C-alpha cells in the first residue's frame, strides 16, 4: 500500500506540467494567430491543470497536518504553503475568467489578456512553490 505521505508528491507533477504547457500554448497562440487550435488546447489543458492543482493543494494541506517540523524547515514549509495557495487562487481565477469568456464568446477581445496575465502569475507562483517544495525534500528530507 502507498504511504499517505506519498500522495502529495504523486499528485503535484501533472498539474505543474498541464498548467505550464497550457500557458506555453497560449503564448504561441498569441504569436501565431492563424492557429486557433493552440488556444483551444491551452484552454482544456488549463481546466485539467486547475482541477489537478486543487487535488495537489488538498493532498499537501492534508500532509502538512501530519508532518512535524521546526526551525528553518517550518519557515520554508510556511512559504511553500503560501505560494501554493497563491498559485491555486491565480489559476482558479484565470480558468474561471477564461471559461466565462469562452461561453460569452469574448475570448478574442482585449480582455483575453486578463486570464493570460493571471496564468503567467500562476506559472511564476508554481515555480516558486516547486522550488520551496524541493528544498523541503532535499534540504530537510521531508516526505522521505
Spans of model-derived segments:
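Polytopic transmembrane helical bundles with strong interfacial aromatic enrichment
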Residues: 1-144
Amino acid at each position: 500500500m502507498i504511504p499517505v505521505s506519498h500522495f502529495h508528491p504523486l499528485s503535484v507533477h501533472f498539474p505543474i506540467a498541464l498548467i505550464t504547457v497550457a500557458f506555453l500554448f497560449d503564448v504561441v497562440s498569441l504569436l501565431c494567430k492563424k492557429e486557433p487550435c493552440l488556444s483551444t488546447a491551452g484552454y482544456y489543458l488549463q481546466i485539467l491543470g486547475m482541477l489537478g492543482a486543487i487535488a495537489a493543494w488538498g493532498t499537501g494541506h492534508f500532509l502538512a497536518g501530519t508532518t512535524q517540523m521546526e526551525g528553518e524547515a517550518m519557515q520554508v514549509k510556511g512559504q511553500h504553503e503560501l505560494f501554493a495557495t497563491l498559485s491555486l487562487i491565480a489559476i482558479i481565477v484565470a480558468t474561471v475568467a477564461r471559461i466565462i469568456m469562452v461561453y460569452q464568446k469574448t475570448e478574442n477581445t482585449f480582455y483575453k489578456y486578463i486570464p493570460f496575465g493571471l496564468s503567467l502569475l500562476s506559472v511564476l507562483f508554481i515555480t516558486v512553490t516547486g522550488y520551496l517544495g524541493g528544498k523541503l525534500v532535499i534540504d530537510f528530507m521531508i516526505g522521505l
